[in-house]
Every structure is written in C-alpha cells, then in structure tokens.
C-alpha cells in the first residue's frame, strides 16, 4: 500500500533559528498551514492491477476504466464522505440523499477510516455487480446494520427507510404520509423477523430473502451495470 | 449533469442493491445494455497537432461537437483520425475541458478568437470555470464596448451623406451637431464661438474702473457706466445671435422635448434670459437690485463654450460620473468641519476679543485651515486652540487627498476613451479608403482582363497578352463567373467613376457627342449588349441620334488618369475587336424584357484620343454597338443600373 504523504515539514526546520518574535510567529503560521497541507496532499496509490484483478471479479480492462474515472474525480486517490454525498445529490436532486449516502459510505468504508480508497470501492462494486447472491445479501445486511453489531433492530431499519424516503423528496404521488416509513418497516420486520424477537440476524435475513422471489429476481437486475 | 457524475453512475446503480430487500414491488428490469465496446483511444488531429484521448472522455458531454456524432463529419477514414482545421493552441483548452470539466480562458489569446473556437466546438461560454470567469467577462465587455464605440463613431461621425430627400430640419440639425460637414456650419460654429468670447469679455471689462474725464476730484467709474451705450449695443448683438441660434436649434431638433430638457439648451436659456428680463423690468429702484443680480447669470455664457470644447464636456461628464466620490468628499469634509469648529470654539471661548464668536464663525476658520489656505484673519491664541488648530490642518490634507485620485483616474479613463474614439474615427477614413482601393483592385482586375481581350475564344492563344494567360486557376474561374453574370444580366461591369460620371451626365441631360471609338474597345461584351437589343438600339439610335455617346477608351483613359489609376492599355488586337457574331446570337436574353439601362456620358471632344476614330463597323450589329440609349423615361432605370456597360 503506497501511502505517499507530501510533508515538507522537514525542509522548514533547517532554517537558522533566530529569536525574533516575527520569526516565531511566522513559523507557527507555517506549521499550521503545513499541517493542513499534509492532510490534503496525502496521495494514495492502489495495489497493482493484477492483485486487484485477482481479488475482484472484474477484468483488467474494466478495472482500468473504473480507475480512470475514479482518479479523474478524486486525484488524491481517496473518496471522502462529502464527495459521496455530492455524488448522490446529483443523482437524486429531488430529495435529500445525504443520509443514505452517509450509510452507504459507512458500508463502503469497511475499515472505518473515514475515506474510501480505490480498493474498497472496487471490492464493493465487485460484490454488488458480480458477486453471488449470498455475498450481495450479506453486503446489504451490512448496510442496514448501522452500528455494525451484527443485528438489525427496528431503529436502524427506521433510519434506513427514512433515508430512502428522504431521497424521494417532497413531491411524490401519492403524497407521502408521516407514518409511511413506519408501516414499511413493520412490513419488513414481519417478513424478516422469523422468531419475532425484534431484531433481525444475518441468518434470518438471508433465509427470508432467499424465500422471496421478487428479491431474488431483482438481484439479477444489476448484473450488467458495467 | 456534470460529466464526472457519469463516472459514478455504475456505483450509484450498484448501490441500489441496498434497496432490494425493502422493495415491496418488483423492481423494473434494467435497460438493455448495448455491447459495450472497450474504451478506445481516439486521435484528434488539429492542424497537424495530434491529440489523443479516450472516447469516454469525449462522450462526457454529448451535446458538443466532439461528444456527439457530429464529429463523424470530420473523420478521415484513411488516417483513422478526426481532422479539424482549427487553431491547435485553442483546442488544448477545449480538450482540457472534457478532461477536467472546467473550461479555462487563455490569457494571451484574443477573446474573440476564443469565443469563435467555443462556438465551433459547441461549447457555451457559460462553461468557463469560476477561476477564469471574471477575467473572461471583463475582457469580453471591454471588447464589446470598443466595438460599439466603433460603430457609433461610424454612424454619428461624419457619416454617410444624408438621403437626398432630407428636409431642411434634418440638414440644419446635422449642421449643428457636426460643424465639419459643411462650410456654412463651420462658419456659424466659429461665429458663435467668437460672440461668446466677446460677450464674456465685455462682461468682464465693463467692471474695470476707467478713469473719468478730468474732473475734480477725478472720479473712478467702471467702464460699464462710462460707456453704457456701447456695452448695451454689444450685449444686444450677442444676445440676438444667441437667441437666433437657440431658436434655430429648437426648430431643427428632431425631438423638441428632449432638446428642451438637455443641459446645453438650459445653459443657452440661462444665458439669454437675464437680458430679456432686464428689458421687460422697468428701471425702478426696488427691482433694480434684483436686476443687478440677474446680470450675474450672464457669466453662464461661458458654459456655452462646452459645445466648442471637448475637454470641457469631458470634465463635466467626469464630475457627473464621480458624483459619489464627490459626495463622499463633501460629506466627510462637513463632518470634519463641524467637529473642529466646535472644538475650536470651545477652546477659544475664554479668550477676550476673540474672533471665534460662534461655531458658525469658527466654520470659516476650519475651512480655511483644512484646505491649507490660512488667510490669517482668524487665529487661535490659546494653547489648546493652537494644538487643535494644527490637528485640524493636518487632517484636512488627508481628507481632501483621499477621493481626489479616484476622480483623477475617472477623468483620465474617460479622456483616454475619448482620445481613442477620435483617433479611431480619423483612422477609420484612411482604413476605409484603403479597403475601397483594395476592393476596386479586384474589380479592376476583371475589367483589365476584359480589355486585354481575355473574353475571346481560346483559339488565338498566343496572341493573348501574357498577363491574361498568367492568371491563376482561381482567377480564371472567378472571371469566368463574372462573365457569366454579365451575360445573364445583359449588363457589364464597369468602374465607379464611369458610373458616377454617367449618373451625373444623365441628371444633367448633358450634351453628348457621338464618338464611335469602337476600334479601341473589346467589342465582345458590348456587341453582345447591343445585339442583345439590336432592334431597340437601332430604333433608339434613330430617334436619339444626338443624345448618345459611348465612353471611348480614350475617355476611359482620361478617367483613369483622373482617378490616379494608370492602366496600361492592353494590346489591341484587331481580332479581339471583331465581334464574333455567333456570340451575340447565342444570347438568349429577350431584348423586349431587357431594360436597356445604358447610360450615356459625354465624351469631352477635346480629349478624344487618336484611337477613337469613327470606324466603319463590320457588321450591322456593330453600328449600334456604339450607340447607347438611355431611357430617361423609366423610373426604375437608375436604381438598377449599378453596373453600367462601358465601351
């Protein structure tokens, strides 16, 4: 993993220290700026193409296309949450996509570092587009499990559903009512929660989804997105 | 949507997997996916410089030239690249827009050229990125302003001549606005200027004390009282002239209301009104005080000079445009004056026999001190007063110095703008003259070619003049085209002078003489013309035997010399002069429909050169070839005959 940080702090320390007030002040300012610079100048380079190809289900050409687009948009090599939100806002201009983007970001950011590197990006895409049903469902479970504790409870589901409905925006037909998300969640839980204990585990989730034909069929929809 | 977003589309679609378990209805099927060709590298060749880019990059903006199928028009199958014959340096910026999504404006290129490139590639100028947007807009505005000034200068300047049917009003107004257009206007302009000066000087002189005739004690009177009649006469004369001018302007103004409201007319009114009021008001003691005050307004006559001086106008305009700065200056000065006056008053209050009797009295001291005049009629005597006095004078300089640079820079900008406009106007005439000369060069080329017998058949190739043979392929085709046009319209090309002279001759109905100098003319086209309407020509010839003439080559030469163009007469090969009869017969323009709008011009007999001898025309058709008929009766004649045949 090549993390190249451009820190030029080494060079400044070589100056002759004088006891000027002005000089100390200048140094202080300089260091402040450099700290900021360091954060922004960190450039990330992904692993080699062959490794990525081995790890994911994409071909070399597809990886190349993906990386070119990715690098163009994020020259520093990482995506942060802000960018995620902006991207989603552009795709869903009617409503507020920031909450869902936030959850999505957390799902992509498997290492919880606050930034999504190209490997994470490509790995997730590989699962979503070329993965098995099992993998896709597990990824979705991970998305719904906001606090990553292995269980989905009603509050988490509410948050997710509300976030999705937020993306719809105000102008919908039929008109969005206050308790529509709640009803939706109830329906979901009724279906998924086998033992009616108020939480959904991974196995319950997998089982219930595999029983549902609609979901199975829909999972094949996004096969050819690339 | 921004192009970059297209990159993220697969990701967004993939992330929709997260909705699946929640979906209560089956999701719609995905749109049919075309077999995605692998991303390929396109080569764009712009004037030899090769740019290579991914196809995807160009596809980001599908509503531009490069992003749409429009670029296929430029595809060169042999080399497999897209070729554009445009500026490669500019293309760099265009391509960078596709790559980065931001359009940057090149600093050293002309903004107009940049705009044209953008228009070609289908990019809207609004796409210019924020970093370069302000500069782009500024430069564009500057350009547009300059062009507008140019156009304005062209129109208003000493512009085109008024249409013949303009009324007295329009002519008068034009004479007033542009004194340079006619001598009378110029004379009027100077006369009024002179009288303004006289009036102002008289006003000044009549207050100088002249020594009265020797009297004991010698009394000093102002000259105005000593020679009241002389001054009154001078004043009357001036006012009469001014009144006349004002009334004439009022009459000639295209929009009287607007004229009445304009500044110059107000000045005019203010200049002449006191005189009339003085006449009307009876000379009794009560009113004469006011009457004297009115005389002060006579000094406003000096503002009439602003019509005569551009500098004054610029100054006035500057002050108007700097109104806010002046206002600020005034406001800050007032504030400072009040503050300091108050302080000084209270500082000097204790002193006995002080000049600072009240705050308004201290105003005078403050103003005099702040503007660093320092008359010395009011001086502080206490120490505190002196301290505050010095602070006052120091701050005065600052407060006054602040807005002055703004005003000065405004004035300089406007002044230079004006200079530029004037210079451009002056240069415009030279430019236009040169352009006209160049244009006439090309028309002359064709005429020259005609005279050099180029219109004959290629049979006698060797006899053709070298200059005829050495024309480029383009010229050949061009001349052929002009020739075709001539044949089509049964008119011929000629030069400006011939035409204008002919026009003059027609309006004069002048004396014409017949001179058949066919021998020196390439008869080809003219015989075409004549045989085009032989019957008519003949008929006319008989009827208007005396009123026709043809422009002999000699006269043509004379005209040439007049115009300063020296055209070497091409070799006159007899063969070229013999009209090929079959040529004329081939013409299929109906003589009946044909408006034989031929103008005859008088050939000054004295200048008829030797060449123009009355030759006995070979064919019958040729007899009338020398005769041109002017159908003076037809009203549609003159406008149509832009190009007249000339023999």
Curated annotation (Swiss-Prot), chain B:
Origin organism lineage: Eukaryota, Metazoa, Chordata, Craniata, Vertebrata
GO biological process, one term: action potential
UniProt xrefs under Pfam families: BTB_2, DUF3399, Ion_trans, Shal-type
Protein name, as recorded: A-type voltage-gated potassium channel KCND1
Sequence ranges marked intramembrane in UniProt: 360-371, 372-379
Annotated GO MF terms: A-type (transient outward) potassium channel activity; metal ion binding
Gene name of this polypeptide: KCND1
Reactions the enzyme catalyzes: K(+)(in) = K(+)(out)
Cytoplasmic side: 1-183, 253-263, 309-323, 416-647
Residues passing through the membrane, by range: 184-205, 231-252, 264-284, 288-308, 324-345, 387-415
Binding partners and assembly: Component of heteromultimeric potassium channels. Identified in potassium channel complexes containing KCND1, KCND2, KCND3, KCNIP1, KCNIP2, KCNIP3, KCNIP4, DPP6 and DPP10.
First-listed, main subcellular location of the protein, grouped into a coarse class: membrane
């Amino acid at each position: 993993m090549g993390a190249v940080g451009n820190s030029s702090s080494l060079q400044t320390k070589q100056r002759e220290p004088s006891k000027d007030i002005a000089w100390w002040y200048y140094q202080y300012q300089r260091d402040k700026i450099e700290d900021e610079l360091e954060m922004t100048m960190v450039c990330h380079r992904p692993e080699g193409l062959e490794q990525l190809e081995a790890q994911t289900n994409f071909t070399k050409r597809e990886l190349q296309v993906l990386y070119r687009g990715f690098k163009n948009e994020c020259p520093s090599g990482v995506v942060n949450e802000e960018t995620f939100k902006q991207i989603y806002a552009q795709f869903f201009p009617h409503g507020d996509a920031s909450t869902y983007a936030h959850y999505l970001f957390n799902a992509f950011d498997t290492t919880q570092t606050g930034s999504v590197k190209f490997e994470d990006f490509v790995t997730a895409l590989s699962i979503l587009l070329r993965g098995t049903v099992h993998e896709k469902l597990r990824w979705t479970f991970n998305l719904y499990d906001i606090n990553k504790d292995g269980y989905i409870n009603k509050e988490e589901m509410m948050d997710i559903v509300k976030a999705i409905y937020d993306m719809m925006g105000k102008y919908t037909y039929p008109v969005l009512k206050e308790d529509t998300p709640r009803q939706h969640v109830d329906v979901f839980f009724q279906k998924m929660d086998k033992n009616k204990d108020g939480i959904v585990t991974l196995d319950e989730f997998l089982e219930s989804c595999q029983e549902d034909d609609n979901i199975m069929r829909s999972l094949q929809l996004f096969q050819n997105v690339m | 949507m921004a192009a970059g977003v297209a990159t993220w589309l697969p990701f967004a679609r993939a992330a929709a997997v997260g909705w699946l378990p929640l979906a209560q209805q089956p999701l719609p099927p995905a749109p049919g996916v075309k077999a995605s060709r692998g991303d390929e590298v396109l080569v764009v060749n712009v004037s030899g410089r090769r740019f290579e880019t991914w196809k995807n990059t160009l596809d980001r903006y599908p509503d531009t030239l490069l992003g749409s199928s429009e670029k296929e028009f430029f595809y060169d199958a042999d080399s497999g690249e897209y070729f554009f014959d445009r500026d490669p340096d500019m293309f760099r910026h265009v391509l960078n827009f596709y790559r980065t999504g931001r359009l940057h404006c090149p600093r050293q290129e002309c903004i107009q050229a940049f705009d044209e490139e953008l228009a070609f590639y289908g990019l809207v100028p609004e796409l210019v990125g924020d970093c370069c947007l302000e500069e782009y807009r500024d430069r564009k505005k500057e350009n547009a302003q300059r062009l507008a000034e140019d156009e304005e200068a062209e129109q208003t300047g000493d512009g085109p001549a008024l249409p013949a049917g303009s009324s007295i009003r329009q002519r008068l107004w034009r004479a007033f606005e542009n004194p340079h257009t006619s001598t009378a206007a110029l004379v009027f302009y100077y006369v009024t200027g002179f009288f303004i000066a006289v009036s102002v000087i008289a006003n000044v002189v009549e207050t100088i004390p002249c020594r009265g005739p020797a009297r004991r004690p010698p009394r000093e009177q102002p000259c105005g009282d000593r020679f009241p009649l002389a001054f009154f006469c001078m004043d009357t004369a001036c006012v009469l002239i001014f009144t006349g001018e004002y009334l004439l302007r009022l009459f000639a103004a295209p929009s009287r209301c607007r004229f009445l409201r304009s500044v110059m007319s107000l000045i005019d009114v203010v200049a002449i009104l006191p005189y009339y009021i003085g006449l009307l008001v009876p000379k009794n003691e009560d009113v004469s005080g006011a009457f004297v005050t009115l005389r002060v307004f006579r000094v406003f006559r000096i503002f009439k000079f602003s019509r005569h001086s551009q500098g004054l106008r610029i100054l006035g305009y500057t002050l108007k445009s700097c109104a806010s700065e002046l206002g600020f200056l005034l406001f800050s000065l007032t504030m400072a004056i009040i503050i300091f006056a108050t302080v000084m008053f209270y500082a000097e209050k204790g002193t006995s026999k002080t000049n600072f009797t009240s705050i308004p009295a201290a105003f005078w001291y403050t103003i005099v001190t702040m503007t660093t005049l320092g008359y010395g009629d009011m001086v502080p005597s206490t120490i505190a007063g002196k301290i505050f006095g010095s602070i006052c004078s120091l701050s005065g300089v600052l407060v006054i110095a602040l807005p002055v640079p703004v005003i000065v820079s405004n004035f300089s900008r406007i002044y230079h703008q004006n200079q530029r406009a004037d210079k451009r106007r002056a240069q415009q005439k030279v430019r236009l003259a040169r352009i006209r000369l160049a244009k006439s060069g090309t028309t002359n080329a064709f005429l020259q070619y005609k005279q050099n017998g180029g219109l004959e058949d290629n049979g006698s190739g060797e006899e053709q003049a070298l200059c005829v043979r050495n024309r480029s392929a383009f010229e050949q085709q061009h001349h052929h085209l002009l020739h075709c046009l001539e044949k089509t319209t049964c008119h011929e090309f000629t030069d400006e002078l011939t035409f204008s002279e002919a026009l003059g001759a027609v309006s004069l109905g002048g004396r014409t003489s017949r001179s058949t100098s066919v021998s020196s003319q390439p008869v080809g086209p003219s015989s075409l013309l004549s045989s085009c309407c032989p019957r008519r020509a003949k008929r006319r010839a008989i009827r208007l035997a005396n009123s026709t003439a043809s422009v002999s080559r000699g006269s043509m030469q004379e005209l040439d010399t007049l115009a300063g163009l020296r055209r070497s007469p091409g070799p006159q090969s007899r063969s070229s002069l013999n009209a090929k009869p079959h040529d004329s017969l081939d013409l299929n323009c109906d003589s009946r429909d044909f408006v034989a709008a031929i103008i005859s011009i008088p050939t000054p007999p004295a200048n008829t050169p030797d060449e123009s001898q009355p030759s006995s025309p070979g064919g019958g058709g040729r007899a009338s070839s020398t005769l041109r008929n002017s159908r003076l009766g037809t009203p549609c004649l003159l406008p149509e005959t832009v190009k007249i045949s000339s023999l």
